């Protein structure tokens, strides 16, 4: 490990120790607002709309947590963060939770003293090129210029992939997705590399989307999910189970529209615990027993959130793939509410 990396990790750990000395739950309640670290602008995942209101797949997680804790999904302040600033912002207490398409890795989990509490999107890194480049495989990119975001796993995966395939490239460093889209569109790089979901989002926003192809290779595993500070385990539990309430709701056929009807009629013990009709799940994490119910009502279940923001009917057009429910061949399921 390089000394700079070591001292950087130590500094982050020190920030976390200070920030976690007080309860995040107490801070959020006292403030009356959840502060959520977010992407500066990734269409479908987290981006302000024409009215400046943040919308997207990751935004829905922030709304679910705010609804669970504060009773109102709109009581969220979104702080746009780059790949380089996001973890420091969380560690220092600038944000309460980070939901910014961030990959769960060994070093981030251990050295940075941060906790990834769930995976809300299973992804992998890919490459995007203009059809005019005349390549159909990432293994044909030898000597190419590649737009890549600094401070990310993308940067490291890119180096590994080219080294493993005995190829060379010239990186064109970018700070965020918006800059990557701009430089790629301007021809500053031959290819843009990031998570495949991010590529689909970027392509959808470009005027010449029909002329852009996402190459078939997926060169990494990118489990993306919400992150909290290490040491405040109760807050981690709140974020984790607020998210899993959305996943469980989809499994049991509970939607934003039918939740009240299901709650009034169900005899399924798991659903009754999930919706706070039996047991004391909420009390175990410092909330009331309707916390999961409010989380679901914020934006709907996991499937509703996926389809509304990034699904097949949207301009992003992502298939569920690995993010389908376990009953549908995917990896997505919630631990038992018991």
Curated annotation (Swiss-Prot):
Xref: SUPFAM superfamilies: Periplasmic binding protein-like II
Annotated NCBIfam families: 3A0103s03R
Keywords, in A-Z order: Amino-acid transport, Periplasm, Signal, Transport
Family statement drawn from the similarity comment of this UniProt entry: Belongs to the bacterial solute-binding protein 3 family.
Primary residence: periplasm
Top-level taxonomic group: Bacteria
Subcellular location: Periplasm
GO CC entries: outer membrane-bounded periplasmic space
One of the GO biological process terms: amino acid transport
Protein name per the record: Glutamate/glutamine/aspartate/asparagine-binding protein BztA
Record SMART domains: PBPb (SM00062)
Free-text function comment from the UniProt entry: Part of a binding-protein-dependent transport system for glutamate, glutamine, aspartate and asparagine.
InterPro entries linked: Bact_solute-bind_prot3 (IPR051455), Lys_Arg_Orn-bd (IPR005768), Solute-binding_3/MltF_N (IPR001638)
């Amino acid at each position: 490990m390089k000394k700079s990396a070591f001292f950087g990790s130590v500094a982050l750990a020190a920030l976390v120790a200070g920030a976690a000395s007080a309860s995040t739950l107490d801070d959020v309640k006292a403030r009356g607002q959840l502060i959520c670290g977010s992407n500066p602008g990734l269409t479908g995942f987290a981006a302000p709309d024409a009215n400046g209101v943040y919308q997207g797949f990751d935004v829905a997680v922030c709304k679910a947590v705010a609804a669970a804790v504060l009773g109102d999904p709109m009581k969220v302040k979104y702080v746009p963060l780059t790949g380089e600033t996001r973890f420091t912002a969380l560690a220092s207490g600038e944000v309460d939770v980070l939901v910014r398409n961030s990959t769960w890795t060994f070093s981030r989990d251990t050295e940075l003293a941060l906790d990834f509490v769930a995976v809300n999107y299973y992804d992998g890194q890919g490459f995007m090129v203009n059809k005019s480049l005349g390549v159909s495989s990432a293994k044909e990119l030898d000597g190419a210029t590649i737009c890549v975001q600094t401070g990310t796993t993308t940067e490291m995966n890119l180096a590994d992939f080219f080294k493993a395939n005995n190829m060379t490239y010239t990186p064109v460093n970018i700070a965020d997705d918006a800059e990557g889209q701009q430089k790629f569109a301007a021809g500053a790089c031959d290819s843009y590399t990031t998570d495949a979901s991010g590529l689909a989002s970027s392509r959808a926003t470009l005027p010449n989307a029909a002329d852009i192809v996402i190459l078939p290779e997926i060169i990494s595993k990118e489990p993306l999910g919400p992150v909290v500070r290490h040491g405040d385990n109760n807050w981690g539990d709140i974020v984790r189970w607020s998210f899993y309430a959305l996943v469980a709701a989809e499994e049991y056929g509970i939607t934003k529209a039918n939740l009240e009807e299901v709650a009034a009629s169900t005899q399924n013990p798991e659903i009754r615990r999930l919706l706070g009709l039996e047991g004391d799940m909420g009390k175990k994490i410092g909330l009331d027993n309707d916390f999961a119910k409010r989380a679901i009502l914020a934006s709907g279940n996991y499937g509703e959130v996926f389809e509304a923001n990034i699904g097949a009917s949207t301009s992003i057009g992502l298939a569920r793939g690995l993010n389908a429910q376990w009953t549908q061949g995917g990896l997505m399921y919630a631990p038992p509410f018991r």
